[in-house]
UniProtKB/Swiss-Prot annotation:
Contains an N-terminal extension, a central body region and a C-terminal tail. The C-terminal tail, which inhibits the protease active site, and the N-terminal extension are both critical for binding and folding of ASP. Its main location: periplasm. InterPro entries: ASPCH (IPR040536). It comes from Aeromonas sobria. Residues 1-22 form the signal peptide. It comes from the Bacteria. Forms a complex with the serine protease ASP in the periplasm. After translocation of the ASP-ORF2 complex from the periplasm to the extracellular space, the complex is dissociated in a pH-dependent manner. Required for the production of the active form of the Aeromonas extracellular serine protease (ASP). Acts as a chaperone that helps ASP form an active structure in the periplasm. Formation of a complex with ASP in the periplasm also inactivates the protease activity and likely protects ASP from intrinsic proteases. Dissociation of the ASP-ORF2 complex after secretion in the extracellular space generates an active ASP. It is found in: Periplasm; Secreted. This is ASP external chaperone. Keywords: Chaperone, Periplasm, Secreted, Signal. Degraded by ASP after secretion and dissociation of the ASP-ORF2 complex.
Amino acid sequence: MNKPVTLLLATLLAPLSGQLCAQESVTMDGKQYSTIEVNGQTYLIPDNGSKKRVARSLDSKVPQQTLRRGDVLMQGAASPELTVSGTLLVEADDASAKALATRHGLNFKQSSGGIALLEAKPGTDLNAIATKLKSEGVNVQIELSGAEQQPK
């Protein structure tokens, strides 16, 4: 009788534990970092020391963390630092990319081969814009730059 109850509890709690771990805090070399998801990968971002409480809605979703131009990210202790450039890469032709840029308050930089570069103004939350674009069915990536970054 205990085995089915335990299995049922584990099944019910598994999704919740994943959400609770999604925004965790990590300490390395005496510095505090929090996790952030960018382009489907988890990175570490320096925690500025603020002890903000995370408000959860009734569906238990954690609000998305903001990401701005100049933010520095790391994948781990030994990984190089990556800097958020403020540019979004979107899969769109020239006309569509220009329309997206206008609609979302971005600057159209250039387009080639169906990929356009859209630049955000300083202080813009890139995660919020990327989420909006994805909800519109647009393939989007937030550009990260680093001295040792190489394509996979």
